[in-house]
Amino acid sequence: MAKHLFTSESVSEGHPDKIADQISDAVLDAILEQDPKARVACETYVKTGMVLVGGEITTSAWVDIEEITRNTVREIGYVHSDMGFDANSCAVLSAIGKQSPDINQGVDRTDPLEQGAGDQGLMFGYATNETDVLMPAPVTYAHRLVQRQAEVRKNGTLPWLRPDAKSQVTFQYDGGKIVGIDAVVLSTQHAEDIEQNVLHDAVMEEIIKPVLPAEWLNESTKYFINPTGRFVIGGPMGDCGLTGRKIIVDTYGGMARHGGGAFSGKDPSKVDRSAAYAARYVAKNIVAAGLADRCEIQVSYAIGVAEPTSIMVETFGTEKIATEQLTLLVREFFDLRPYGLIQMLDLLHPIYKETAAYGHFGREHFPWEKTDKAQLLRDAAGLK
């Protein structure tokens, strides 16, 4: 592969779409805490002065959706009308129904292992050895930039920052290996009274330099910090936000394919979410085992059917054993039936709100990031 550029972006927890994702997952977590078998599909819409929470939820739990919503917005940092949104005064509307009994009869089974998929669909998982967390570097560092923005905003280092922010990083590759960073974009909402030159210097020193490895930066690296020159109006006042609108930010930054299904607000019976997590787990273990440098897994399902309709392994010519053998190993060591993968990854816990900002993959404490099958795979493949 010749020289090329690759770009990924991320958005902060205060971005309108991410506010919506976090509210949806906060509702999911609150329900799972009381009722692990709940069926939840929770969608959120945010706009100036209002939040609408809707969807289909079947549960024995009772949760205070208004309180969950306000607490989530408050934790993000929207606590004053000067920011364009206020957790204490925004309207919170709820339009929740129950999951269709037609879906229930396809999912629920006497034998849990025969639990059917909650919908048809295709999901992808990916891993690459170009970073220590086995994730693509562009999206990894895009996430770290907006995470750092939130950190210096919340700890008072840069108190004039506001919650809404976006990042974008363009990496240079040569022969498939990273050789540098070509461009960095960081746009951050800020207080009215801050001078742009002060903002520019502070963002450079407190956000960009501490995050991006110096060996990848050079005199030709381009920096675009608030390139419009002003970003006072942000959050839900600047744009409306919806759950599920940042599916590439949530996954691999465009470096792997995507089946189209969003994650936030969905309980683990929805294979859009749980099977995408399982596919990441499979791909990461294959790469961690040294069986390939890059690995993409596709898995697909039919509604109401437990067994996947297909499993595909793609290794982009980096495999150390035949891909047919890799596929057999996946079938042998990973149970990708809906209930099997829920058990395998221990998914019936309130762990989802944290996933809803800064990416669902690449943070080691999530169960789908474990590499506990790597040695088993390596041994079974006959590699020393």
Swiss-Prot record:
Instruction: Cite a single GO BP annotation.
Output: one-carbon metabolic process
Residues the record lists as binding K(+): 43
Question: What are the binding positions for ATP in this chain?
Answer: 15, 164-166, 230-231, 239, 245-246, 262, 266
Which molecular-function annotation in GO is an example for this chain? ATP binding
InterPro entries registered for this protein in UniProt:
ADOMET_SYNTHASE_CS (IPR022631), S-AdoMet_synt_C (IPR022630), S-AdoMet_synt_central (IPR022629), S-AdoMet_synt_N (IPR022628), S-AdoMet_synthetase (IPR002133), S-AdoMet_synthetase_sfam (IPR022636)
Which metal ions or organic cofactors does this protein require, according to UniProt? Mg(2+); K(+)
One GO cellular component term:
cytoplasm
Q: Which reaction does this chain catalyze?
A: L-methionine + ATP + H2O = S-adenosyl-L-methionine + phosphate + diphosphate
EC number, UniProt record: 2.5.1.6
Q: Where is this region: Flexible loop?
A: 99-109
Q: Which keywords has UniProt assigned to this entry? A: ATP-binding, Cytoplasm, Magnesium, Metal-binding, Nucleotide-binding, One-carbon metabolism, Potassium, Transferase
Entry keyword Phosphoprotein = no
Quote the pathway field.
Answer: Amino-acid biosynthesis; S-adenosyl-L-methionine biosynthesis; S-adenosyl-L-methionine from L-methionine: step 1/1
- Enzyme class comes to transferase
- Pfam families recorded for this chain? S-AdoMet_synt_C, S-AdoMet_synt_M, S-AdoMet_synt_N
Q: Give yes or no: UniProt keyword ATP-binding.
A: yes
Q: How is the cofactor bound?
A: Binds 2 divalent ions per subunit.
What name goes with this protein? Answer: S-adenosylmethionine synthase
Q: Which gene encodes it?
A: metK
